[in-house]
Amino acid sequence: MKIYLVGGAVRDALLGLPVKDRDWVVVGSTPQEMLDAGYQQIGRDFPVFLHPQTHEEYALARTERKSGSGYTGFTCYAAPDVTLEDDLKRRDLTINALAQDDNGEIIDPYNGLGDLQNRLLRHVSPAFGEDPLRVLRVARFAARYAHLGFRIADETLALMREMTHAGELEHLTPERVWKETESALTTRNPQVFFQVLRDCGALRVLFPEIDALFGVPAPAKWHPEIDTGIHTLMTLSMAAMLSPQVDVRFATLCHDLGKGLTPPELWPRHHGHGPAGVKLVEQLCQRLRVPNEIRDLARLVAEFHDLIHTFPMLNPKTIVKLFDSIDAWRKPQRVEQLALTSEADVRGRTGFESADYPQGRWLREAWEVAQSVPTKAVVEAGFKGVEIREELTRRRIAAVASWKEQRCPKPE
């Protein structure tokens, strides 16, 4: 029996990145031998075991053979005669097909070290094309390591295109697509994930609402980048700089979906695109089974981001109504989330990357003023039933009006 550290732990250590999880491959052993040594078996379809002390995963070396469609249609073979090289060959990328023995020596049968040095994401073997989930995984790795200068090898991107055009991605379940997307949204450069999907044709298959934005022009005065698809990825990049929250990043990604519905004869104007985009947000989220809280914020951002841009022109009643509409009294975090997504929208434009966004400050200040109006004082004043709500709203409007007169510039 020989044990090797494999995969991401080896890769990230070589890149000088923190190692989070360690996975091990056991060569020359059997399930019974592992059980006799005190390991606990957890794998149903293939033999994976938990170490009795560290609880890290130890898998018997195995090979996989395509036996059906999609990413689950594989037959696994695990036996003492499966070599380390056999096991590493079934992995997706060469940089993930590295192993380290107990002396610290790196085993690299597929030139993963060279690809690490050259910052290349390259598939190990043609078997890559048998698993459609790998298209999303490579896009996610491209996003995760973009800041280190990694790019996808030409032949790997070509294979990803072939897989997409062959209809392989249609076998992916919504849950897996969302899981990979959610993970990509946590990276430093989530926009790279969607750009890679577009480059291989997968964006049109998995995110047609976003793909439809490419080629749709916006007024050059407000959008020097012109293309709405490019603007969308720029805003996502900006959102990633402003917030680590997946819901903020996803909502920013979806903020302009309504522009994809504008008839070409009305281009480059997109009047009413915000409310129009709400149905597309709902459609996308329902298809991918996006969690409700993330979906709800994306709907609100699509509907109200343009309203927040015009904040100085809003009257106090409209401002308080906005807080009602986003359910800010019960979910106050949404005020900050809308401020961040709206700022990402403004700064996600060519030449505006460092622009100030005072509307965000005014929105936050107005919220502090409105929510500081005490409900208790209204009750103590003798108001009852629906009168409490009505009087509370009236006092909030008055408080915002007083603040706006002093703090918010009047529209020209």
Curated annotation (Swiss-Prot):
InterPro entries: CCA_bact (IPR012006), HD/PDEase_dom (IPR003607), HD_domain (IPR006674), NT_sf (IPR043519), PolA_pol_head_dom (IPR002646), PolyA_RNA-bd (IPR032828), tRNA_CCA-adding_enzyme (IPR050124). Its EC number is 2.7.7.72, 3.1.3.-, 3.1.4.-. GO terms for molecular function: ATP binding; CCA tRNA nucleotidyltransferase activity; cyclic-nucleotide phosphodiesterase activity; magnesium ion binding; phosphatase activity; tRNA binding. CTP binds at residues 8, 11, 91, 137, 140. Its cofactor is Mg(2+); Ni(2+). Residues 228-329 form the HD domain. Mg(2+) binds at residues 21, 23. ATP binds at residues 8, 11, 91, 137, 140. It catalyses: a tRNA precursor + 2 CTP + ATP = a tRNA with a 3' CCA end + 3 diphosphate; a tRNA with a 3' CCA end + 2 CTP + ATP = a tRNA with a 3' CCACCA end + 3 diphosphate. Keywords: ATP-binding, Hydrolase, Magnesium, Metal-binding, Multifunctional enzyme, Nickel, Nucleotide-binding, Nucleotidyltransferase, RNA repair, RNA-binding, Transferase, tRNA processing. Magnesium is required for nucleotidyltransferase activity. The keyword Amino-acid biosynthesis does not apply. The keyword Ribonucleoprotein does not apply. GO terms for biological process: RNA repair; tRNA 3'-terminal CCA addition. PANTHER family: MULTIFUNCTIONAL CCA PROTEIN. Belongs to the tRNA nucleotidyltransferase/poly(A) polymerase family. Bacterial CCA-adding enzyme type 1 subfamily. Monomer. Can also form homodimers and oligomers. Comprises two domains: an N-terminal domain containing the nucleotidyltransferase activity and a C-terminal HD domain associated with both phosphodiesterase and phosphatase activities. A single active site specifically recognizes both ATP and CTP and is responsible for their addition. Catalyzes the addition and repair of the essential 3'-terminal CCA sequence in tRNAs without using a nucleic acid template. Adds these three nucleotides in the order of C, C, and A to the tRNA nucleotide-73, using CTP and ATP as substrates and producing inorganic pyrophosphate. tRNA 3'-terminal CCA addition is required both for tRNA processing and repair. Also involved in tRNA surveillance by mediating tandem CCA addition to generate a CCACCA at the 3' terminus of unstable tRNAs. While stable tRNAs receive only 3'-terminal CCA, unstable tRNAs are marked with CCACCA and rapidly degraded. This is Multifunctional CCA protein. It comes from Escherichia coli O7:K1 (strain IAI39 / ExPEC). The lineage of its organism: Bacteria, Pseudomonadati, Pseudomonadota, Gammaproteobacteria, Enterobacterales.
